[in-house]
């Protein structure tokens, strides 16, 4: 299973449920990488989707502890259940938020990390894969600058 996330220099990923700084290059990268894949997302992150609708061109899976139906989503109630669905998919990607990343990281072997070179005041963080001996940066896929902010799209693999 794979995951995709944008992190700031301090590995922050958001504040109060939103991305303080979002780059159009990262949004494009996200669309390219997730198109056609199964995406696993938390219920609170769905609230940030346009119209709270499923992402088009993807199989949308919501991971939540709540017993609920979400139109357009397959709802699962445990990381194990999400991982099992992911194993049966051609490609499955964890797309957040913070709690879902923490729960699903043990099931992932590939991480697409956009490093955004700034440090806004985050309250939610992704584990620092550079400090984790179980993960290795294998490739910088793309780099650039947008609105004066540098970024790199990086590929990490579990070793």
Residue ranges and their predicted role:
Residues 1-159:
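Enzymes that bind and transform nitrogen-containing heteroaromatic metabolites
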């Amino acid at each position: 299973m794979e995951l995709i996330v944008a992190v700031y220099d301090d590995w922050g990923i958001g504040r109060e449920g939103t991305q303080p700084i979002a780059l159009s290059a990262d949004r494009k990268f996200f669309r390219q990488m997730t198109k056609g894949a199964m995406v696993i997302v938390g219920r609170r992150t769905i609230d940030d989707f346009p119209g709270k609708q499923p992402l088009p061109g993807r199989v949308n899976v919501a991971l939540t502890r709540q017993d609920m139906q979400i139109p357009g989503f397959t709802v699962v109630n445990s990381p194990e259940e999400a991982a099992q669905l992911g194993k049966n998919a051609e490609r499955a990607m964890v797309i957040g938020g913070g709690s879902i990343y923490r729960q699903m990281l043990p099931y992932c072997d590939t991480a697409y990390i956009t490093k955004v070179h700034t440090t806004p005041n985050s309250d939610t963080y992704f584990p620092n894969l550079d400090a984790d001996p179980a993960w290795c940066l294998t490739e910088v896929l793309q780099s650039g600058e947008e609105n004066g902010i540098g970024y790199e799209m990086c590929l990490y693999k579990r070793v």
